Design a protein with these regions (language model features):
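Cysteine-centric segments in proteins
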Residues: 20-151
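N-terminal signal peptide c-region/cleavage motif recognized by signal peptidases
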Residues: 14-16
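Sec-dependent signal peptide recognition
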Residues: 1-8
């Protein structure tokens, strides 16, 4: 009985694999009816407007603050269970889009790169897809995403 309790206690303390190897965990933000400018989900996620359970985001942005403001300059992500607002640190061109670099506002910041590959353009929105990579202390995680930006 004692061995079993020790084994169970050890498993509970171990936490997820990402926590053990030090890689940041990219979590979903569950926010039904979010009023965002850009909303990105995991690439394999099926979004259904009428299903509140499907409103799961890996990155979102607020609407631009004013004329000419960059709506993707300060996105939000949930990393290691905490909602983080990111600050843009750079942009570089990529065939078919761009790679934007960000960092969190922590003393030991998370570094984030988002490849924005342009997809279909509509009257009020543009589709994007790519990869989001989150790094910290030499370890990183990445996910493929899809989504759009616009009103």
């Amino acid at each position: 009985m004692t061995r079993m309790l020790i084994a169970i206690f050890s498993m509970l303390l171990a936490g997820p694999v990402a926590a053990r190897d030090g890689a940041p965990r990219i979590d979903e933000i569950v926010w039904y009816n979010i009023d965002s400018y850009c909303s990105f989900t995991r690439a394999d996620h099926r979004f259904d407007y009428n299903d509140p359970e499907s409103w799961r985001w890996v990155l979102f942005t607020n609407f631009p603050a004013g004329d000419g403001a960059d709506p993707i300059e300060s996105p939000f992500m949930r990393i290691d269970g905490q909602l983080k607002q990111l600050a843009q640190t750079g942009i570089r061109s990529l065939d078919g889009g761009a790679v934007r670099s960000y960092q969190s506002h922590d003393a030991n910041p998370y570094l984030v790169e988002v490849s924005l590959l342009e997809g279909e353009r509509g009257i009020e929105s543009s589709a994007f897809s790519g990869v989001i990579t989150v790094s910290r202390n030499g370890a990183s995680s990445e996910i493929a995403y899809k989504g759009d930006c616009g009103a």
